[in-house]
C-alpha cells in the first residue's frame, strides 16, 4: 500500500504498544513485526477511531483528554478503620491535564485529535480499588450495554487481525461489523479482549516473538534514528558521540576521571522463554533469564528500588553477606563473653592462682546457670535461630539482586564500590527504555516514570515525611518534668517513633494509608496512635533491663580500647540524631548526606576550638601537672628496682602499675584537651564555611556567630561523643516516660501533619509535598481534610512558578514559622538536588572525594586535595540558568504575621561573598536535562541580577532557617 497507509499503521501500533507494555515508540519499530501481532483483532478499533488514519503530521492533544490518563492507584488498598462509607468520593470531578510523553520528555504526535470520551490507554485498576474513571467521573455509564456490545464484538472479530494491510480490507471489515455509537466505546473493549486472549494457545507463537529484536534491524535502526536498542544508549551519527545522563562524551576523546563507562544494560536478545514461565518455575531459568523475569514481574517498585539502593550501599553481594555474618557473630560473642565471665570464673581464686585453668568452673552452663538466666538464654538461642533463617532468605534475595546488577545493569560487585549512584540511575533509565514489560500492568505506568527525582521519592517516601516531621517541631520529645522542656532525641527514641508513627501510617506495601487522609477518620486514627505510644512505652519498660545490659557491654567492648590507646578521643564530638534530621535535605539519599556530614566535622571542630576557654585550660594544666608528677615519681622508682617495685602495693590490692596507668591516662586526656595558644579567630567566616556542608545557618544567629550563645546552641547539635553515648544508655530507661506522657499529646498534630503534607502524584502515589519540589504537579491532587482537590495550574517551564503556586496558598493561610521554614527548605533541597545530579563533578563513588581543578591542562598527574578547598561541591552551582527562580520568589505575602522576622530579602547580608558569582565552583558545564521535568533556559533571557539576589538569600543568610 501507500506510504501514508504504512505510516499510519506503524504509528498506531507504536502508540498502542507503548502504552500497554511501557515500550517507547523508537524501541517498538524494530522489536515487533506486523506478522507477530496478526492474531489480535482490531476491527472495532480500526472502524471507530481516528488514531490510525490521516496524514502523519504533528498535532496536539486536547485539554479534554483528562480521562485518557487514568490515575495509577499507588496507595493503600484498604482502610485500617474498616469504615468504607467515608471513602474519598469518586465524583469530585477532578480534571487532570495530561500530556503523553515517551519517557524522555518528548510529546507523542498523532495524526489527528484524539477522541477524548474514553480511551484504552487508561491505567488498569488494582484489586479492591476504584479505577481512575470511576473516581473522577463517578462511574462508567451504560455498563450493561457495554457488556452486551463487547460480547457481540468478540463473536464478529474473533479472527480479525490487529493491523489490516490495506484500506479496502479495513472498509470491508467495517461494513461487516456492528455499528457503535462512537469510536471511543469500541476502543475501550480492545484491551480487555487482548488480556483475555493472551494465554490462549493460538497466540502462543506470536507472544513468544513479541519482544524479539533482530541484530540487523537494530543495526539499521541505530544509524537511521540514532538509538541503539540493544546497547541502551543514543548514538549521534554526525558528532560521533554517545549521550549520557550527564551530557555527551566524545568518541575517542578524553574521558572524565570520575565517570564510569556509559554502557547499556545487557539484555537478552531473545526473551521468548520468559513469556510463559510461571512463578513456581522461575528457578529453572538461567541467572540471566531469572533476573529479567524478576524485573519484568516487579509488583512493588518502591520495595524494588529500595533493595537496589541497599545493595549499592552495601557494596555488593560479598560485602553485604560478610557484614550480616559479622553482626550476628558480634551478637553471639557479646552474650557469650558476658555469661562466661559472670558464671564460669571463680574470682575468689584469682589472687592465689597463676593459671587460667585454676579459676575456670567446669560445666558452668549446666550447674551455675539456672532459673531465669537459663530461660533467657534459651530465648536468645531461638532468636539466633530465627536470624539464621532470615539470613537464608536474605541470601536468596541478595542473589537475585546480584544477578540484576550483573546481567541487566552490567555492573559487577567490584565496580559497585567505586561507581557513582548517578550511573546506577542512568542504567535503570536505559533498562526502562529497552524493556518495561511487566506482569502487573499498573506498574507499567510507574516504570515509565523512572528518573532521579522519582527514584529518590520512592526510596525516601518515608524518610521525607520524617524530615518534615522533625523540622516542623511537631513532636514533643521532652521529659514530663516541670520547667524542663529540652528535646532529647536518641537512637532508641528514634526507633520507637519509626515503629509507632511510620509503621502505623504506612501499609505493608509502603504506601500511606487512606485513613490518615480522611477527616472522618481523624478522631479514630488519633486514638489508635495514642494507644500505640502507650503500648510501645510498656514494651520498653519490659525490655529496658536487657537492652541496658547489652548496650553497656557493647559500648564497653567497642570503645574501651579506643579510649585506652588514644585518650584524647574522649573529647571527640559527633552530630546528634536531631542534628542529622535537621541538616538532611528532602530527597537526599543516605550516602550523599553521610559524606556531606562527615566532611563537615573538621570545620565544626575548627569553629568550636576558636573560642577561648582560659579558665578551663588553667584547670586542665593543673590536673595534667599533678598527674604527670605522680607518673614521673613512680616511673623513676620503677627504674631503680623494676622487678619488685611494679608489684608493690601502694594501696590495698592496687599496685604501682595500676596507678601509673591511671595517672598516665589522666595526663594524656588533659594535655590533649588544652587549646592551642595561638590560632586564627574568625568565627563568622568559619561558620559560613561550615554551613556549606551542613546547610544550616539560622537567621537568629546572624551577627552573633562570635558569641558564646551561638556556640552553645551549635554544641547541642555537635556534642561530645561520650555524652551522646551516656544519653543513649539513659534513654533506654527514660524513653518509656516520653512515650507515655509527651508523645500521646502530639497525636492530633501528627495526624494533621500527614493529611496536610501529603500530595498525590500520578504514577507515584502519595508523597510528602515538600519532596516533589513543585515539579510537574499539574496532575497532583492535594489531600485536605480527607478530600482531593485540584492544585492550581502551574507553569512547568519555571520552577519558581511551580513552587510558589503550590505553596503560597498554604503560606497565606498559615501563621506558623515552621510552614515558612519547610517551604524554604524545599527550595533549598531542590537546588542541592540538581547540583548532585546535574554536576558531573559530583558523579563519584560513595566513598570518594572529587579531584582538584586545574586550569592548566598540561598537569596530567595532580595530587589529591586534602585541605577541603573542594567544599564548594556541596554549594549549589552559581550558573543562573540552573535554577528557575524568578521574580515571584521576591513577592512577600502581606497578610502573614511576623514574616519580616524571617525574611531578609530586602536587607544586605554583611557576610555576602558574591564577588565570584557567575560560574559554578565545581563544574560550569550545563548538562542536558533528562526526565526531570525541566525545559530550556527561560527562552534565552538574562535574569542574572534577580536570580543572584535570590540565590545569595538561600545560600548565605537563610541557610537552614
Swiss-Prot record:
Disordered as annotated region, ranges: 1-91, 126-180, 198-225, 244-265, 900-940
Reactions listed under catalytic activity: a 1,2-diacyl-sn-glycero-3-phosphocholine(in) = a 1,2-diacyl-sn-glycero-3-phosphocholine(out); a 1,2-diacyl-sn-glycero-3-phospho-L-serine(in) = a 1,2-diacyl-sn-glycero-3-phospho-L-serine(out); a 1,2-diacyl-sn-glycero-3-phosphoethanolamine(in) = a 1,2-diacyl-sn-glycero-3-phosphoethanolamine(out); a 1,2-diacyl-sn-glycero-3-phospho-(1D-myo-inositol-3-phosphate)(in) = a 1,2-diacyl-sn-glycero-3-phospho-(1D-myo-inositol-3-phosphate)(out)
Disulfide bonds: none
Membrane-spanning ranges: 325-345, 375-395, 618-638, 655-675
PTM comment: Phosphorylated by ATG1. ATG1 phosphorylation is required for preautophagosome elongation.
Gene Ontology CC terms: autophagosome; cytoplasmic vesicle membrane; endoplasmic reticulum membrane; Golgi membrane; mitochondrion; phagophore; phagophore assembly site membrane
Chief localization: membrane
Cytoplasmic side: 1-324, 396-536, 558-617, 676-721, 743-961
Protein name as it appears in the record: Autophagy-related protein 9
Organism: Vanderwaltozyma polyspora (strain ATCC 22028 / DSM 70294 / BCRC 21397 / CBS 2163 / NBRC 10782 / NRRL Y-8283 / UCD 57-17) (Kluyveromyces polysporus)
Organism ancestry: Eukaryota, Fungi, Dikarya, Ascomycota, Saccharomycotina
Gene label: ATG9
